[in-house]
Curated annotation (Swiss-Prot):
N-terminal signal peptide: 1-25
Record's protein name: Arylsulfatase
Reaction catalysis annotation: an aryl sulfate + H2O = a phenol + sulfate + H(+)
Role summary: May function as a glycosulphohydrolase involved with desulfation of sulfated polysaccharides.
Length: 328
């Protein structure tokens, strides 16, 4: 299979930055694949919603599963039957919309391996709801008399994680922290019940932090300290609010103010992404979960320059299906 290497050369006034990603699959490579790079919840014709695949020692792990994840996996040659685990950073629908397809199509294609879904409190209830949705289809199966269909939850396990959880899997360890995507008062019932998480994956000789959705967070900065790769969300908050105004002209002004406040606290601007990467002294930076989606090199350069005003290391603004080798 032909190997394609693409290098972003961003000749900025601050210097030349380059980041290389691989465009072809390899069973022996450890890779991070940005399956979907567009922030939700509005569907986009050019970009799928937030989802990633991490390939380690030939095993497949999905990190967030936005709408379209199953199809995006197929585009990079990965079979949903071979997914070993799904990690959910939080339970907003643009990060979970693809999970029903993964679970139901695995059932329909008789997947035999166990799939573990890791996620914040509420993940078990979410997955149970997917099983409920699958009930009628599983009972009818293929409509052949005498068939005894397997239960919807066959070979599916849920493990709820939260701030401070540490996991040890055969291929890596995982550290879990609560980030600032939610702003419930600390100690409140909502604070206990709803958590948005960031993950640190420590492979044998490589480390990756996936921020998930987050605003500025000292906990995320600490988690990211010295990692080889930071995969961070990013949002142009002013542009996003203006887009909402254009599509919702009748919305009261106070509503827009509230939306702007929410986005500013719960997401990262380009400059804030650079500040995070700089403060954590990460080896390289991949930016995903963009709002708006970036389609031209001019748009990519515009936002990269803002990030690079703070962080001087290698930067890649990811597109759907980009592949990054996890190797020093």
């Amino acid at each position: 299979m032909q190997k394609i290497s693409i290098i972003f050369n961003l000749f900025l006034s601050l210097g030349c930055l380059a980041f290389t990603f691989n465009g072809s699959a390899s069973e022996t490579k450890n890779e991070w694949i940005t399956l979907g790079t567009m922030a939700g919840p509005i569907p986009n014709a050019k970009h799928s919603q937030p989802a990633n695949a991490m390939l380690v020692n030939g095993n497949t792990y999905v990190v967030d599963a936005g709408d379209g994840t199953a199809g995006q996996l197929a585009k990079v040659g990965l079979d949903i039957k071979n997914v070993d685990a799904v990690f959910l950073s939080h339970l907003h629908f643009d990060h979970t919309g693809g999970l029903p397809a993964i679970l139901s199509l695995r059932w329909q294609t008789s997947a035999r391996n166990e799939l573990v879904v890791y996620g914040p409190p509420g993940t078990q209830q979410t997955v149970d709801g997917i099983f409920e949705y699958m009930t009628y289809g599983t009972l009818g199966h293929y409509g052949v008399p005498g068939q005894v269909p397997a239960p919807a939850n066959t070979n599916i396990k849920v493990v709820e994680v939260e701030d401070g959880t540490q996991l040890k899997l055969p291929d890596f360890t995982v550290d879990v922290i609560r980030n600032s995507h939610y702003s419930w008062p600390k100690g409140s019932e909502e604070w206990k019940k709803f958590q948005a998480l960031s993950f640190k994956f420590s492979l044998q000789d490589y480390t990756v932090v996936y921020t998930g959705d987050t605003g500025p967070s000292s906990a995320v900065e600490k988690l990211s300290s010295g990692v080889d790769l930071l995969v961070s969300e990013m949002m142009d908050i002013d542009h996003t609010v203006n887009m909402i105004k254009e599509t919702n002209p009748q919305m009261p002004k106070g509503k827009f103010i509230g939306i702007h406040k929410h986005l500013s606290k719960h997401h990262l601007s380009p400059k804030q992404v650079g500040e995070l990467a700089k403060a954590a002294n990460v080896g390289s930076l991949v930016i995903t979960h963009m709002a708006p989606g970036l389609d031209t090199q001019a748009e990519i350069d515009f936002y990269t320059k803002q990030v690079a005003s703070e962080y001087k290391g290698p930067i890649s603004v990811a597109q759907d299906l980009n592949r990054y080798e996890l190797k020093r």
